[in-house]
C-alpha cells in the first residue's frame, strides 16, 4: 500500500532519518524526519497556477507544536492547541527565511509549508529538524525550488564549537547560533552570544555551514528515488519591456534617486512611475503589457539603478558614503513618571522606548514542550502604520513585530544582571514612531538607554547596526546603517548588535546565492566600526546605569526564610500572607526555596512587611523576657501571644509567686503581660512564666529566678 523511501545518516552523534511515501501522501511533498527521538512532519502544497492579478509570491510557513509530542495535555478551558505561541511564530520565520530566496523569480503560486512536531525527546530541539524536513519536502515536491537547504545549530562551549548541542548543553554555551544555506552559500544566520568577537562568530557560521553538508547529501539521496517530476515553470521574458523602460525613463529615474530626502524622493519616483504607466498602459487602444507586469518591471528597474549608482559612485540614495551612519540623537528621561524612558533617533528612524520594573508576580509563565518556565525579561516591539506615513491595521502583533522584538531581546539579554543581583521583572516596550530602515536596531539602542535610565545595572551599553550588500559579479559594496530602500533593493540584511567588546546578537538574511566568507568578514568588520560610533553617540545621553531607581519604580527587598517556615508565613488557605499584604500594602512573593521578595514603592511598607514575616519565622530564645498579650484563659493557665504569631502557655502555677486559685484572678483576655520563655515541653509546646518577671518593669525578679533554677 505504501511506497516508502528512507534515508538515514549519523549526524553530530545522533541518527537523522528522513522518510517519505507513507504519511500525508496527498500533499505535493511530505517528509517525516527523526533526529534522536524527536519527530516532525513537514508537508508542502503549492497551487497549480497563480491567482489572477497576483503580483507577489504568497509563501506561508506554519510551524506547530502539539503538546502530545511531549506527553502533555494543553492547559486552558478548551484543552486544545490555540493560536501560535511566540516560539512557533519565531520558528516559522526561521524556516521561511532560507527557503524564500530559492524560489525562482516570477513564481507566484500560493505555497504553504506546514511543519508539525509530533514527538519531542526533550533533548533535541525540533527547530533545526523542522528546517531540514521542510527543505526535504520542497525538494521532493516538484515545485520549482533551487534547494536543498541545510541547517544546523552551533554552540561554543569551553572555547570549542559544538554542532547541534543538546538542550541541556546550551546552558553552558556562550553562543546559540543557527545557520542555514546550500552547498555553496550561507543564506540565513540567527544568533545570541555572550560578547563574542567577530572572528569567533564568523568561525561559528562557517563551522555550521560545513556541519550540515551531510544533510544536503541525504536530501539529494532521498530525492533521487522519491522526487516528483519537476513542474514546468518558465518565467516570463520581460527583457524587451525592461529595455524600452530603460531607454525612455532611465535618466529621469536616476535623477529621482539623487534626491536625498525620503518624502521628496518618493514623490519624484512616483512621478516617474506615473509617466511609465501612461506610456505603457494607454487609456485608448490595447496595451501590450498588463498593469502588474509594468509595475513589476518598474520595481526591477528601480533596484538596478540604485545598485548601479552605489557600485559606480560609492554614494548612496541619501548622499552618504558606504560607511557613514546617519545623524543620531539620544535622549533619556523623556517620560519622567515612567520607570525609565528613551527617545532614539537615527536619521528618519525613531523609537520611543519605555522600561517598566515589576515583581515576581509580573513574570511571564511560558508553557513549552520542555516544561513550564518563567521569563523575567520581556521586550515588545510595535510598528504602527503611521511610522511610515501610511494607514493600516492596528491590533495584535504580527510575525514581523514578534521577530524584531525577539532580535532586540537577544541583543540585550546577555548584559542583564542576574535575578540575584537585581530581583525585578523587566518589561521594555519599543514604539516605532518613524521608520526608514533598521528599526529593530533602533530598538536595541533605545532599550539599552531606557534600562540605564531606569537604574537597571546593565553590564555594558548595547548598540545595533544594520548592514546591507550590493553584489554584481565580482563587484560588491557593503553598506552601513541601511535605509529601507537599500534593504528592499539590496542582496543582504545583516544586523549586528553588541557592546564595545563583542557581539551579543547577529542576524543575517541573504537574498542571493554566493555570499562568501570574505564578504561576511568585511561586513562584520565594518559593523564593528559602526557599532562603536553609535555607542559613542548614545554616551552623550547616558554612559552607565543610574545609581538609583526612578521615583515611581517599586523597591524590592529580598530575605530568606527556612523552607519549613513557608507554610507558617502563608497560613491556612493563604490567610496570613493575605493579612500581611492587606495591612502593610506591600507585594510579597515567596519562592519554593524560601526566597521572599517584598515589593512596594514605599520603604515603610517594605519594612513593616519584613518585620512581620521575621516575627513569624524567627525562633524565640529560651531565657529571654518578652512582652505579650493574653489571648485566652483556661482553668489550667493562660495562653499568651508573645512572639509574632507565636502563642505559649503560662501554667496556673507560673502566673504568680503566691498560690492562684483561678486564672482570671490574675489575668484576663487582652491584658498586656511580661513573660519569660522557660523552654519547650516534650511535644514542643512553649512553656512561659509570669511570676519570675516584675510585671511593672519587665525585669526579672532575682529571688524567683533562683527558685526557678533550683526547681529545674
Curated annotation (Swiss-Prot):
State the needed cofactors, names only.
Mg(2+)
Record's keyword terms, sorted: Cytoplasm, Magnesium, Metal-binding, Nucleotidyltransferase, RNA-binding, Transferase
Q: Which residues form the signal peptide?
A: none
| Location within or outside the cell | Cytoplasm
Task: Kindly state which reaction or reactions the protein catalyses.
Answer: RNA(n+1) + phosphate = RNA(n) + a ribonucleoside 5'-diphosphate
Task: Enumerate the Pfam families for this protein.
Answer: KH_1, PNPase, RNase_PH, RNase_PH_C, S1
Taxonomically, the superkingdom here is: Bacteria
Q: What's a single GO BP term from this record?
A: RNA processing
In terms of SUPFAM superfamilies, this protein maps to:
Eukaryotic type KH-domain (KH-domain type I), Nucleic acid-binding proteins, Polynucleotide phosphorylase/guanosine pentaphosphate synthase (PNPase/GPSI), domain 3, Ribonuclease PH domain 2-like, Ribosomal protein S5 domain 2-like
Question: What is the top EC class of this enzyme, as a single word?
Answer: transferase
Q: What is its EC number?
A: 2.7.7.8
Q: Which Gene Ontology MF annotations are present?
A: 3'-5'-RNA exonuclease activity; magnesium ion binding; polyribonucleotide nucleotidyltransferase activity; RNA binding
Domain S1 motif, first and last residues per copy: 623-691
GO CC annotations, alphabetized: cytosol
Residues given in the record as Mg(2+) binding sites? 487, 493
Checking InterPro entries in the record gives: ExoRNase_PH_dom1, ExoRNase_PH_dom2, ExoRNase_PH_dom2_sf, KH_dom, KH_dom_type_1, KH_dom_type_1_sf, NA-bd_OB-fold, PNPase
Q: Which HAMAP family match?
A: PNPase
**Can you tell me which family this protein belongs to?**
Belongs to the polyribonucleotide nucleotidyltransferase family.
What functional role does this protein have?
Answer: Involved in mRNA degradation. Catalyzes the phosphorolysis of single-stranded polyribonucleotides processively in the 3'- to 5'-direction.
Give the protein name, as stated in the record: Polyribonucleotide nucleotidyltransferase
This chain's source organism reads: Rhizobium etli (strain ATCC 51251 / DSM 11541 / JCM 21823 / NBRC 15573 / CFN 42)
